[in-house]
């Protein structure tokens, strides 16, 4: 599995106590309780929080497909606070974002690093945002493998292919050349919200909802 190096230092971030707030709605039919994320899903809001891994990616893909079926013409809002994670899991989210009909607006809250930054940049053009104190970090993928020399060679070729593919897609979404992306992702490259906007990873920094 190919991952990013930053997540290894930040994988212990967990929701406080693992508690999820509940929201109670009242209607003519009575009361119904939702966890906060399910309630926000009704408003077409999806949260990508924590390390990107297969289980989380499957849930996000399912939510994207569900919201497309609900209304294929209304935007979906993806909020990202992630140190990054699995490349293959992240690419499943990316492909689903591009596959569905609704525009997916992305917003960074907190941090969007590595695969998190890649998914932030993959939002619909003109609809990619950061909150003012967000941090964005781009870099090349990290992979490790042990085994026979021939197997190591196979995996080395694979990670080079993945790096080129990620760089090509980031160049497409950011407006940079492939050479510029290769240079700027050679090492961990941290950016403020304003720097991410100037670089083309997002379209605007927002501090309040539009009136």
UniProtKB/Swiss-Prot annotation:
GO MF terms here are: ATP-dependent peptidase activity; ATPase binding; serine-type endopeptidase activity
Q: Which GO terms describe its biological process?
A: protein quality control for misfolded or incompletely synthesized proteins
User: Where in or outside the cell is it found?
Assistant: Cytoplasm
> Top EC class per UniProt?
hydrolase
Q: Which residues form the active site?
A: 114, 139
> What Enzyme Commission number(s) does the record list for this chain?
3.4.21.92
**Keyword set, alphabetical order:** Cytoplasm, Hydrolase, Protease, Serine protease
Q: Which residues form the signal peptide?
A: none
GO cellular component term, pick one: cytoplasm
Q: What are the transmembrane regions?
A: none
Subunit text: Fourteen ClpP subunits assemble into 2 heptameric rings which stack back to back to give a disk-like structure with a central cavity, resembling the structure of eukaryotic proteasomes.
- Function as written in the Swiss-Prot or TrEMBL entry: Cleaves peptides in various proteins in a process that requires ATP hydrolysis. Has a chymotrypsin-like activity. Plays a major role in the degradation of misfolded proteins.
Q: Please report which protein family the annotation says this sequence is part of.
A: Belongs to the peptidase S14 family.
What is the recorded name of this protein?
A: ATP-dependent Clp protease proteolytic subunit
The species this protein belongs to is: Pseudomonas fluorescens (strain SBW25)
Q: Which gene encodes it?
A: clpP
């Amino acid at each position: 599995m190919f991952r990013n190096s930053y997540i290894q230092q930040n994988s212990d971030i967990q929701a406080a106590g693992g508690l999820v707030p509940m929201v109670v709605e009242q209607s003519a039919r009575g009361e119904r309780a939702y966890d906060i994320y399910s309630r926000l899903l009704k408003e077409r809001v999806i949260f990508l929080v924590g390390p990107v891994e297969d289980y989380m990616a499957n849930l996000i893909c399912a939510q994207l497909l569900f919201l497309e079926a609900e209304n294929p013409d209304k935007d979906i809002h993806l909020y990202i606070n992630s140190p990054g994670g699995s490349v293959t899991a992240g690419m499943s989210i990316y492909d689903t974002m591009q596959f569905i009909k609704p525009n997916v607006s992305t917003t960074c809250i907190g941090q969007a690093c590595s695969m998190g930054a890649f998914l932030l940049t993959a939002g619909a053009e003109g609809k990619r945002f950061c909150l003012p104190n967000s941090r964005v970090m781009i870099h090349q993928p990290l992979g490790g493998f042990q085994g026979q020399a021939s197997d190591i060679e196979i995996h080395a070729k694979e990670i080079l292919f993945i790096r080129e593919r990620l760089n090509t897609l980031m160049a497409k979404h950011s407006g940079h050349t492939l050479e510029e992306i290769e240079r700027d992702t050679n090492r961990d490259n941290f950016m403020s919200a304003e720097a991410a906007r100037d670089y083309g990873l997002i379209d605007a920094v927002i501090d309040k909802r539009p009136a």
